[in-house]
Amino acid sequence: MSSPRPSTSSTSSDSGLSVDTTAYPEESKYTSTAPGAGGLSDENRYRDVEEGEAGADEPFLPSAKKQAASGSRTSRLIWGLVILCVAGWLWGLVLFVTQNRSAQQSVSEALQSHESGAISGSSSSGKPVTLEQVLTGQWLPRSHAVSWIAGPNGEDGLLVEQGEDQGKGYLRVDDIRSRKGDATSQESRVLMEKAIVQVDGRTIFPVSTWPSPNLNKVLLLSEREKNWRHSFTGKYWIFDVATQTAQPLDPSNPDGRVQLAIWSPTSDMVAFVRDNNLYLRRLSSKEVVPITKDGGADLFYGIPDWVYEEEVFSGNSVTWWSGDGKYVAFLRTNETAVPEFPVQYYLSRPSGKRPPPGLEDYPEVREIKYPKAGAPNPVVSLQFYDVEKQEVFSIEAPDDFEDDDRIVIEIVWGTEGKILVRATNRESDVLKVFLFDTKARTSKLVRTENVADIDGGWVEPTQYTWFIPADPSNGRPHDGYLDTVIHEGYEHLGYFTPLDNSEPILLTQGEWEVVDAPTAVDLRKGIVYFISTKESPTERHLYQVNLDGSNLKPLTDTSKPGYYDVSFSHGTGYALLSYRGPSIPWQAIVNTETDELKYEETIEDNAGLARMVDSYALPTEIYQNVTIDGFTLQVVERRPPHFNPAKKYPVLFYLYNGPRSQTVDRKFSIDFQSYVASSLGYIVVTVDGRGTGFSGRKTRCIVRGNLGYYEAYDQITTANLWGEKPYVDETRMSIWGWSYGGFMTLKTLEQDAGQTFQYGMAVAPVTDWRHYDSIYTERYMHTPAHNPNGYDNTSITDMTALQQTVRFLVIHGASDDNVHIQNTLVLVDKLDLAGVQNYDLHFYPDSDHSINFHNAHRMVYERLSSWLVNAFNDEWHRIADPVPDDSMWEKVKRSLPMLVN
């Protein structure tokens, strides 16, 4: 990480922490301060969240009045016993009433007795954040996705807008230059007048639209049905802009469900996939030409299978048109050897099929081809379709990986039939880049990187390689491409030219990293735009650099913390710049033609969100870092409103901590963690431990082969540091996470064995990496055959250690197609065998990894909230070892409800 900017921060030592002490307005994401706050005294500035209530160490006892001397020792003894009995009865009554009232109140009502007072970042009369607001998205910033599109003749600054807008039509192409005034550009046009379309007497309600490159046609999708996370099926239609009429994509099969449809660059053809076969529709006729014919349950053409969709492409397409429309490249995926995993649905029918009569009460079972770690992977190969010759062909690659050891991660078309193919071995630590020539039908290996030898790490399956065509008049005599390369322990931009050159021109370097780069390239000016962490691992700023590596400079304000992303117009003359935090997010269209960004139009200022911030008592976020074993790790601490440093607060740790992930960043966010701090009054801490991204390869790659060990150590060490703080109650500490965070919760509790964390909440956890999919798992763990000890070490196996915690909670969706319920069931069996009972378990029927079937999503968070309150109220201590009690005291307690009611 680069040093903090001296103008805004300094570094100090606090309990072994290296702390970023930036002034509050830049420390917190929220800068709304109530008027008059500065006039409060130190005594009044901090208010106890539960001020006025009896503290845990100050039990309510009635004051004893001095009794007159009776002269009789017996009398004094009797009166003393009577007083003690009455006092005991009153104490029991108080406890019962308090507990009964607490049980009847909601979690928020029970714990949000805030005293009014102003602090930095919170309104003096502010209301606490509610769970309802978080779950219904009321705190989400408004944002707009701009769909930039190239004009038919390469015009720049055009964008597609969908939705009724003051009679301007449903689907429009607008010229950004005409939006500021009343003038209408020649390039602005209406593509669809209305949101509904009539086709042969049928009413079509499009849910998605894709204009053709020449803007004369629009591809429409209706009746969309979800498949997996990114994939779906639907019915497709071709809409004619001139006549405002539509026809089926396949006139001979209008009701056929299509899995993918893509325009050709020449706007006269559509490639589409149905029933796992690839087809071509020429708009000049109604005929549909099958490109492949043997697709089916085990063979996929043009679309990914489950594991490639989830772990490689994060999308539903593995079909790529060449720029001139003469070729279609696509992947052939053979799943024949991949084992199946059954996912059961007890209430729903994802297939849409009714069961046969008499079988209505049986669950629907969906058999998914799911390769677990060590199991056979799908065999993937690249094929091509010559549009003119109407033939499918393949090109053999020299020095290619074997079929069972190949993962194709990216395809990039160049010019003149050239195509770059990036592939890795099964364990994702050797990268090979091939150059194919579809005209000559030849190929060669142009680059190999053995990442295992470089730093012991892995190759992430990203798709950001950018082809740079030759332009001798502009200083580019040869074709080339931009790719991310490892340089001195950090990921930077490299420019490879000619295409077969294996040594790049470094465009960036230093102890920081580029992120999903490049973002855009201005070929006319020879400028590369990219987002990076140059200022801080938790920030994102926009930069530009020339193709020769000169003139690197920021385009966003780096004088203060910021988190930006950007999307450029087709010609890079304009961009949608999105500021995500730490202050109120905004979006603006900017002009990039000048040396400095010129703001053309603000399209979102989130004024409503700003008003909410002024009205609510939000947590204060303190960004810090800790140094553990020489590694600098980013931390954010969320303090409750009216934070009182003299009070002892419970602490909840929230984590994800998956490889290359990031949770601690400067984006504006009001989420479940914010609710816990604001409404429940607890401190919430997140530390991005080793293995997470954007702090260099050394920090990231150390976890390879032993997931969970260093990450858990970092959580425990940080929790111990927090436990030493005077305002932290080290006897009430919990940790929670979802998915990889669920695994990390259990792994941390296992490694800690109750020494630091008393509680934990794990949602949809992996408990044994042999149960998770091969491509993700083996990237970080190698194969089970290669690393058997690593798999043993990283599994949740020490039930005795889990028994040392006070209590933990495990939640899982019963129909999770990603992290199978098998993970939790295997864990439960281990707990049963060990006789461990200090846990709670809840399953949600028919819910996948997101747990949202029926009312499940709300119920998950309500359960997490109430369970956490019970934990920090010491309820789990009370029920740890239940025994029958028929004493007189218990009988009196059981009689109290009648007296109360």
From Swiss-Prot:
Vacuolar side: 98-901
Sites carrying sugar chains: N334, N625, N793
UniProt catalytic activity: Release of an N-terminal dipeptide, Xaa-Yaa-|-Zaa-, from a polypeptide, preferentially when Yaa is Pro, provided Zaa is neither Pro nor hydroxyproline
Region called Disordered, residue ranges: 1-67
Cytoplasmic membrane side: 1-76
Enzyme class label: hydrolase
Source superkingdom: Eukaryota
Protein name as annotated: Dipeptidyl-aminopeptidase B
Gene for this chain: dapB
